[in-house]
Amino acid sequence: DGDADAEGSCDNTKEFVRQAAAYIDTYYYEPLTLSGLSERYHVENSYFSKVFRKEMGENLIHYLSRTRIEKAIGYMQQGSTNLAEIAFMVGYDDYTYFNKVFRKMMGVGPREYRQNMKEDGV
């Protein structure tokens, strides 16, 4: 029947997670939260968190952070946009926090990463 809820159907679960991931990929620059996404897809926070991790292989915050950092690297490759502006463009209001997340994920801060790209001719 077409009335199965997201918790009752494996296909529906995969579909809502796929839709949520696509939404994040598109709106990564918005202030996305677990509670906001859970509300959007009409599920409890704990359920959203559990099935997102199961289907995507990483938790929501890591997925969102990775998506934002990948987008930031893309902007770095496109030109000389100010790093604080790039941080804002990918959804970070606080450059210090962006720097911390970037460093944690990439092993170096955004400034060093950009310098390494220039040295490598990227």
Where are these regions (language model features)?
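Terminal helix-turn-helix DNA-binding modules in bacterial transcription factors
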Residues: 21-22, 26, 31, 54-93, ...
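Short hydrophobic/aromatic patch on the recognition helix
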Residues: 47-48, 52, 97-98, 102
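…primarily DNA-binding HTH/wHTH and HhH modules…
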Residues: 100-122
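Residues within helix-turn-helix
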Residues: 35, 46, 82-85, 95-96, ...
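Short, Lys/Arg-enriched, Trp-marked, Pro/Gly-tolerant hinge/linker segments that flank
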Residues: 1-19, 26, 35, 40-41, ...
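Residues within the alpha-helical elements of helix-turn-helix
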Residues: 40, 89-90, 105
